[in-house]
A protein has these predicted regions:
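Bacterial N-terminal signal peptides that target proteins for export
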Residues: 1-12
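Non-catalytic cap/lid and distal C-terminal segments of serine-dependent acyl enzymes
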Residues: 27-314
Length: 314
């Protein structure tokens, strides 16, 4: 097992190094097809490293603001990858502006802002791996995870304090937001999906909904059991109550997503066992499988409307 863990965690470290290039390549302000970007550059924190935060405003933001409109807010991780493929390391993007604009203009969601929080490059895994999952790992696997993936610096709890105690108050002060959990949701993909669910569990009074696209429950980049089992124990004990909360989960079937089905199915059952309903008009849980799709921004962009509608549809 030790050899397997070292190999797996080495792959994680290699994958994380890609995001160093991502940070270097994405310094240019994104140019969305609709709406506009405000950048809070090098937003300082007492809890984690400073980073850019890109806030997307819809095309008619100023007119809506003048009319007294208040806005839903979606907090999204990996903020470098959300708006403009020309500024990303792999020339792919979620194209969030297109989806949100279309849903707003069709009246399916109320006016909405998107807060894109940049990841922290080499510390992405440290910030996005739910810290309390570590408590449910045996000493050997926990130490290997700490050394090889988290760089002996687990930061997920600090990252959430940054979001909740520093960033959200700044956003609420700067923009006419709807501040309550019913209008404040959080989402991401892969490790970003993992930290989104963790955020709602740890701060259920802040986030009323969480979405994980291709959520990376497996921890490493090969099938394994110890890291998912730690997540299951945490979810069993700490999942946000179903009253007033919504959860969205999905995965594809190719690339890294080809590993996800058994782990996601187990998570789905835990969520149902905790009282969430995925049937009927009162459904507060949705889980989907997208055949033939992989682990990339193009795939997530193509289905972004589904979680947004589920979490914020009116």
């Amino acid at each position: 097992m030790a050899m397997f863990l070292r190999k797996t965690m080495s792959l994680i470290a290699l994958f994380a190094s890609v995001f160093l290039h991502l940070n270097a390549a994405a310094q240019v302000l994104p140019q969305p097809d609709s709406g506009s970007i405000d950048r809070m550059a090098h937003f300082a924190s007492q809890h984690v490293d400073a980073r850019h935060v890109d806030i997307w405003r819809p095309p008619n933001f100023e007119a809506l603001k003048a009319a007294g409109q208040r806005f839903n807010v979606i907090y999204m991780h990996d903020g470098q990858m959300l708006f403009d493929a020309q500024t990303t390391w792999n020339k792919q993007a979620w194209l969030v502006d297109k989806t949100i604009t279309r849903l707003m203009q069709s009246g399916q969601i109320a006016p909405t802002l998107v807060v894109g929080v940049w990841n922290n490059g080499k510390y992405r895994h440290s910030e996005y791996f739910p810290q309390k999952h570590l408590q449910h790992l045996s000493p050997g696997p926990r130490q290997l995870l700490l050394e090889n993936a988290l760089q002996n610096k687990p930061q997920a709890d600090a990252y959430l304090r940054f979001l909740v105690e520093e960033l959200k108050p700044a956003i609420d002060q700067r923009y006419p937001t709807l501040k309550g959990p019913a209008n404040t949701v959080i989402m991401g993909s892969s490790m970003g999906g993992l930290i989104s669910i963790y955020a709602m569990n740890e701060y259920p009074h802040i986030f009323g909904g969480a979405a994980g696209l291709s959520t990376h429950w497996i921890g490493g980049y090969e099938a394994n059991s110890h890291i998912p089992l730690a997540a299951y124990v945490y979810l069993r004990d700490h999942l946000a109550p179903p009253q007033g909360h919504k959860i969205y989960q999905d995965h594809g079937t190719t690339e890294l997503d080809a590993l996800y089905a058994p782990y996601q199915n187990f998570v789905n059952q835990i969520i149902r066992d905790k009282g969430y309903k995925d049937q009927g008009v009162q459904a507060n849980f949705m889980t989907r499988v997208f055949e033939g799709t992989g682990h990339n921004e193009k795939a997530w962009a193509a289905r972004l409307d589904i979680p947004v509608l589920f979490l914020l549809g009116q």
